[in-house]
Amino acid sequence: IANPHALTLTHIMPDHLSIHAAREDDMAEITGVLLSSFGHMPVEQAMGNVDTPEGRKAMRERHLQAWREHAKETDVPCGIKCVHTDPTSGKETIVGFSEWFIYANPPMPEHHEQANALISGTWVPEEGGQREKVQAALKPTIDTRRKWLHGRKCAVLMYVCVDPAWRRQGAATMCVQWGVRKCNELGIMAFLEATEEGQHVYKKCGFVEVEKVRCDWEGEVGVFPAMICWPRGTREEDRTPAILSS
C-alpha cells in the first residue's frame, strides 16, 4: 500500500541504499526476498510459503490482503522496502524488506487476542490435521503477543528479510530503524520475535528481550526471543506485560 506522505520519510544512506513505502506491484519481487530468508523454515513451508509459481502467487495475495486490512486502520505504510539504486544505470533493485503493523489508535482490549492474518494459518488445508498442526505450532507466538500487547498502542514487526547478496551491508538495520523512528514519533512500543540471525540488528536498534517464545514443530523446538523497543520516557514500572499472570 503506497502512502504518498510516507515517501517524505525516505532516508538515504551510503552505498546508494534508501527506504521507501512498498507498493502492491513490488510484491512479486519482495516475495523472492522473503523466500530467500524464511523459505527453509518448516512452519513457513507448511503454511504454503514455498518457492513454486502457485506458492509465490498465494503468498503474494496473503501479504497484500494483510496490507489492505492494515490500511483500513492507519495511513502509515505496512510494507517497507530497502532499494539499491545503481549509480551508473539508475536501475532500482529491492534488496531488503520489512513489514510493520502499526496500531497507533487505542485498540480494543481483545485486539491482539486474534492472530495477525499472516500467522492465522486459516488457509492451510484441514486434511490430515495439517491446519491444526500449524496453528498449534504458532499458538505460543500468538499467546505471547496477547500477553504483552493486550489493549496497547503498539507496532508489530512481522518480517525483516534481505537478499542474500546484500546481507551485512546495512539494509536490515535501515528497515528496522525506519519503524523504530516511526514508533518514537507516535510514542508507541515496538514488538517482534527474533530469529538468531536478526537479534544483533534488533539490539542495535534499541530492542530488549522480554521473554523467549518456544515453538514446537514435529518434536523440534525453536526458540525465538520476544523483544520490545519501548518508547522514550517509558517508566520502568510500565515495562511489564499488559496481562499479568494471576
Where is each model-derived feature located?
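Conserved GNAT-fold acetyl-CoA-binding loop/helix
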Residues: 40-65
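Conserved acyl-donor/pantetheine-binding loop and adjacent beta-alpha core of acyl/acetyltransferases
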Residues: 89-161, 167, 215-222, 234-246
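A short helix-loop-beta-strand connector motif used in the catalytic cores of GNAT acetyltransferases and
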Residues: 58-85, 105-108, 129-133, 150-156
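Conserved GNAT acetyl-CoA-binding A-motif
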Residues: 153-155, 182-194
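A structural microfeature
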Residues: 94-96, 172, 211
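A short beta-loop-alpha structural element at the N-terminal edge
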Residues: 18-32, 43
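Conserved acetyl-CoA-binding loop-helix of GNAT-fold acetyltransferases
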Residues: 162, 168-181, 204
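Conserved acetyl-CoA-binding loop of GNAT-fold acetyltransferases
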Residues: 205-212
